[in-house]
A protein has these predicted regions:
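A short, charged/proline- and glycine-enriched loop
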Residues: 98-104, 165, 174, 181
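Short beta->alpha connector loops
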Residues: 111, 186-188, 246-250, 272-273, ...
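Histidine-centered catalytic micro-motifs
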Residues: 178-189, 293-300
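Flexible, glycine/charged-enriched surface loops at secondary-structure junctions
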Residues: 234, 238-242, 294, 434-439, ...
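Active-site core of metal-dependent hydrolases
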Residues: 265-478, 487-489, 531
Length: 653
């Protein structure tokens, strides 16, 4: 944590006790407004924009649990039971409804697409029900009257009551994000789920039936029989599931049958055939049923080029996988699709960020995943055509510009399910080092404490500027694996952000381990995974401390805290019929009206052009090659990174 010099947590007037200085306040209650937190060992740091749970102007009665602390009977804990009766309100607290939560996360720093605030978080019935200040109306006054939406787009601070039925999770000094959403998962091996949860991913969307050739190449669970068996297989895991059906067909009947069986969308993949006719036919079914189409386009350009694919799409919404092209797609200019307003572009993590090893590992990955024969020259040429360092270098910059909206893994099929979040933040770090602060994170032109030119300064000594931070960049990158994939798949009303009314799929991070190893993964309000020590130890902390499944990952709990996402059409046909499942089904919202403009912090559509001979990439007048990057005419060296944060020092054991 970095200390900001020009404000304190207590009033300037001294009372019977000396006011707390910022370091002292942080030691007791965690960082507060205007304090900065470094993310892992990266060059990124975030600044707390507001403190709804205390801090400047609100200090006193911060909720802390423990011996001699606040959350005790007749202090921070009220006598109000969990269900005090319908219609009861606490009139002494300004009409605030007295409905204590099941769990409160105290004094945690929330990092989400809408902003960065410190807050208490209330969870009830598996959902987020309030962000703001936990208190006891019998002994404390409320701090908030509803306020305004944070940054005009986020939640409003709310006061809520801690009761005797409330559990406490300490958020002091920690960061809270929404659970990760991976839209590109090949369901090959059950162990993938543990890897995903241990990395902070709580929603998996994709397809597969195991290590079959069709599944190692394509994220498809084809046909009702396989869909039923896959739902049954995934029922025991505390993750939300969305299955992709096979869209590479001209059979409308087949696709509708798969929707009725429970798919969340379709995958059109070149290995099954990604012709313009197939794309158009699948999108017709998508328009009828409201589901999304995920596209792995035609690398060989057999049935047409990238413009032919765009013509077949006809300005309809589409989720384009690994838009850079190494994972598959029109060679060499697939990446130009980021310019289209109807395309929701995504990356897969093997190309994130471009390093000295990125190109070297891709050839073998392509050969294995797509069942290619090294003895066949045409197969070798196919693999080689997909590996272009110039477009990988451009992908770095397009992420930082907000032109690529989504990050995903491509799990076990040219991607690593446990590294989606980590590689997102590694990319953000590389861009921070190379490009500096985003314009949105730069200070105002005029120093604080002065008026316009020609007028008398307000103060001869300008107020010190707070240190710069990477808030907008952090908000941009966290959105790539939370809210934006949720929007693309029609599940944003349920998951994807830390907002009231949504499922409590949350990840708690120690700042030093941010993006690498979650401290705790909360799934549907219950702790499902956490860093815990030896089970035979006398306390939870002795080594080896490992990410381990918790009670939310055992017994029947996963079915109560997770969803299978399907269409409203499927729910009307009773998806539980003929299946023995504990996990509930949840209807998605229609995805057909979701376009690039709806992607949070990542809706840029710069003009992108690729030289067909040299593979040189031009981004809005900037030139990108595999050696040197030109952004707005300024040369930026070292496109290949030789050292990254969030890497070996975190994985010695």
């Amino acid at each position: 944590m970095a200390e900001c010099p020009n404000c304190s947590c207590c009033p300037e007037e001294k009372g019977p006790f000396d006011p707390l200085l910022r370091p002292d306040y942080a030691d007791r209650f965690g960082p507060t407004t205007r304090d900065c937190i470094r993310l892992a060992d990266t060059a990124l740091r975030i600044k707390i924009e507001d403190d709804w749970s205390g801090g400047p102007g609100r200090s006193g009665n911060e909720m802390v649990f423990g011996g001699g602390k606040v959350i005790r009977e007749s202090m921070g804990q009220s006598v109000v039971p969990r269900d005090p009766g319908k219609g009861k309100t606490d009139t002494s607290a300004g009409g605030t409804a007295v409905v204590p939560p099941d769990t409160v996360i105290t004094g945690v720093v929330v990092l989400d697409h809408w902003g960065i605030v410190k807050t208490d978080v209330a969870l009830r019935d598996g959902n987020i029900v309030a962000l703001g200040k936990a208190y006891n109306p019998e002994t404390m006054n409320p701090l908030h009257d509803g306020g305004v939406a944070h940054n005009g787009i986020g939640p409003r601070p709310t006061d809520f009551v801690i009761g005797p039925d409330t559990e406490v999770i300490a958020g002091k000094g920690r960061i809270l994000t929404a659970g990760g959403i991976d839209t590109h998962v090949h369901f090959i091996c059950p162990d993938q789920i543990d890897e995903a949860l241990a990395a902070g991913v709580t929603t998996l969307i994709g397809g597969g039936t195991g290590p079959a050739e069709g599944s190692t190449a394509t994220t498809v669970t084809p046909g009702a029989w396989h869909i039923n068996r896959t739902f049954e297989a995934l029922d025991a895991f505390p993750v939300n599931i969305g299955l992709l059906g096979k869209g590479a067909t001209m059979s409308t009947e087949s696709m509708l049958d798969q929707v009725d069986a429970g798919v969340i969308g379709f995958k059109v993949h070149e290995d099954w055939g990604a012709t313009p006719a197939v794309i158009d036919k699948c999108l017709q079914v998508c328009q009828k049923t409201g589901v999304q189409l995920a596209l792995h386009a035609d690398s060989l350009n057999e049935a047409g080029f990238v413009q032919d694919t765009l013509d077949a799409i006809k300005n309809r919404s589409i989720h384009v996988f690994h838009v850079e092209g190494a994972g598959g797609g029109h060679a060499p200019d697939m990446i130009k699709m980021v310019s289209e307003p109807n395309v929701l572009p995504a990356s897969t993590n093997p190309t994130r960020p471009l390093t000295v090893n990125t190109v070297k590992e891709h050839f073998d990955m392509v050969m294995v995943c797509h069942h290619l024969n090294p003895a066949v020259p045409e197969d070798l040429a196919f693999a080689d055509s997909r590996i272009r360092p110039s477009t990988m270098a451009a992908e770095d910059i397009l992420h930082d510009l907000g032109a690529i909206s989504i990050m995903s893994s491509d799990a076990q099929a040219m991607g690593r399910i446990g590294e989606m979040i980590m590689r997102t933040w590694q990319t953000a770090h590389v861009m921070k080092v190379r490009r500096g602060f985003l314009e949105e994170d730069q200070p105002a032109d005029k120093p604080k404490g002065t008026k316009a030119e020609g007028q008398t300064p307000v103060d001869e000594t300008p107020e010190p500027e707070p240190p710069l931070a990477d808030n907008r960049r952090a908000r941009r990158y966290v959105a790539k694996y939370t809210i934006n994939p949720a929007l693309a798949q029609g599940i944003d009303a349920v998951v994807g952000s830390v907002e009231t009314g949504k499922l409590a799929d949350l990840v708690l991070w120690e700042p030093k381990f941010f993006g690498v190893k979650p401290h705790m993964v909360i799934k549907g309000g219950q702790i499902a995974y956490a860093q815990v020590g030896d089970a035979n130890a006398s306390i939870p902390t002795p080594q080896p401390v490992l990410p381990r499944p918790m009670w939310g990952a055992t017994g029947l709990a996963p079915g109560s805290i997770s969803y299978n996402f399907v269409t409203e059409r499927a729910i009307k046909k009773n998806p539980s019929k003929g299946r023995t499942l504990n996990k509930r089904f949840k209807a998605i919202t229609d995805t057909r009206g979701v376009f690039k403009e709806h992607m949070k912090e990542n809706n840029a559509t710069p003009d992108v052009r690729i030289d067909a001979d040299t593979y040189e990439v031009i981004i809005g007048g900037a030139k990108v090659t595999d050696v040197t990057t030109f952004v707005e005419g300024q040369i930026v060296d070292r496109a290949y990174v030789s050292e990254l944060p969030m890497a070996q020092r975190y994985f010695l054991f």
